[in-house]
């Protein structure tokens, strides 16, 4: 039996939970697993870290009631308690994770100069470094989801017009745009680094490749981003989600309207985008406090 099946069997046979309750637990585990599969890859329940859980809860919490989010965390805590007790995982990643009551955590983001610092640090000219620079630049310039960037094909790129046709969630297509600086990094990758990486899969249409010349996985991209930011001295926990948050925050801080940002992010519901207005207001408040002459 899989770890999920063992847990569900335990709930049904040892705890005598109703079929409806067992199904609710099953759905909560499936939702978390699906999120990780689409945002970095699912390495197995025994490899999920506290950071993975925090990112999942942050992303999910933007569109759920606090009571629903609490239930999802409770399901994961119960699951990992059983796995830990039976020696099926070495550590419980849910330990010490708590939700703020009645208040959603604001998305973490990087400022423009911080992203610029990271991009400038990727300057040794090696194929993987050139690839990583293009990845970071595109995440920040477009606000794409990790799964969307991972699945990018050459035919989706319009370099001349600085556009990308993105195949988003629910098979919904949209266009995103990139600036001249990002175009420069992308072209350098496509013209110089990508051909040198293209070894075992000469016919692949995937834009971003791993060191073996094969399409890179979401997990590979997430790991690369984390290592890049850690090496640049900014944080040990950077994730592509935070570059997406950074894009949205930068757009709003520079005057973009909420509906436009919603379209660029591919959000179905405007309320999902509205959380970034709180981030922007927080930024504006800090700027006011710092620069207004009367304290």
Swiss-Prot record:
Pfam (any one): Phage_int_SAM_1
Q: Is Translocase found in the keyword set?
A: no
Predominant cellular place of this UniProt entry's protein: cytoplasm
Domain Core-binding (CB) as annotated: residue spans? 1-84
Query: Tyr recombinase domain spans which residues?
Result: 105-289
Query: So where's the catalytic machinery, residue-wise?
Result: 145, 169, 241, 244, 267, 276
Query: Where does this polypeptide localize?
Result: Cytoplasm
Q: Which InterPro entries match?
A: CB, DNA_brk_join_enz, Integrase-like_cat_sf, Integrase_catalytic, Integrase_recombinase_N, Integrase_SAM-like_N, Recomb_XerC, Tyrosine_recombinase_XerC/XerD
Which keywords describe this protein according to UniProt?
Answer: Cell cycle, Cell division, Chromosome partition, Cytoplasm, DNA integration, DNA recombination, DNA-binding
Q: Name one GO biological process term.
A: DNA transposition
What GO MF terms are annotated?
Answer: DNA binding; tyrosine-based site-specific recombinase activity
Is Cytoplasm given among the entry's keywords? yes
One annotated Gene Ontology cellular component of this protein: cytoplasm
Q: Quaternary structure?
A: Forms a cyclic heterotetrameric complex composed of two molecules of XerC and two molecules of XerD.
Protein family: Belongs to the 'phage' integrase family. XerC subfamily.
Describe the function of this protein.
Site-specific tyrosine recombinase, which acts by catalyzing the cutting and rejoining of the recombining DNA molecules. The XerC-XerD complex is essential to convert dimers of the bacterial chromosome into monomers to permit their segregation at cell division. It also contributes to the segregational stability of plasmids.
What is this protein identified as? Tyrosine recombinase XerC
Taxonomic source organism: Lactobacillus leichmannii
């Amino acid at each position: 039996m899989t770890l999920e099946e063992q847990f569900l069997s335990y709930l049904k046979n040892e705890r005598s939970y109703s079929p409806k309750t067992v199904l609710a637990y099953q759905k909560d585990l499936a939702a978390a697993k699906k999120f990780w599969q689409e945002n970095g890859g699912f390495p197995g329940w025994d490899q999920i870290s506290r950071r993975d859980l925090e990112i999942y809860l942050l992303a999910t919490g933007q569109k759920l009631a606090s009571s629903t989010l609490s239930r999802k965390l409770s399901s994961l805590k119960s699951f990992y308690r059983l796995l830990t007790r039976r020696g099926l995982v070495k550590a419980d990643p849910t330990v010490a994770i708590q939700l703020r009551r009645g208040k959603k955590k604001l998305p973490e983001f990087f400022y423009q100069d911080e992203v610029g610092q990271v991009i400038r640090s990727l300057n040794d000219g090696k194929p993987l470094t050139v690839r990583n620079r293009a990845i970071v630049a595109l995440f920040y310039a477009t606000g794409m989801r990790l799964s969307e960037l991972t699945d990018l094909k050459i035919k989706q790129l319009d370099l001349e017009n600085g556009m990308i046709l993105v195949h988003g969630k629910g098979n919904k297509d949209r266009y995103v745009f990139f600036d001249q600086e990002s175009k420069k990094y992308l072209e350098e990758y496509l013209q110089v680094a990508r051909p040198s990486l293209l070894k075992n899969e000469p016919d692949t249409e995937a834009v971003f490749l791993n060191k073996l010349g094969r399409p890179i996985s979401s997990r590979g991209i997430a790991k690369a981003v984390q290592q890049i930011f850690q090496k640049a001295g900014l944080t040990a926990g950077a994730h592509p989600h935070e570059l997406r948050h950074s894009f949205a925050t930068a757009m709003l801080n520079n005057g973009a309207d909420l509906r436009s940002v919603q379209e660029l992010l591919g959000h179905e519901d405007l309320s999902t985008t509205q959380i970034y207005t709180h981030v922007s207001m927080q930024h504006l408040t800090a700027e006011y406090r710092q620069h207004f002459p009367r304290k």
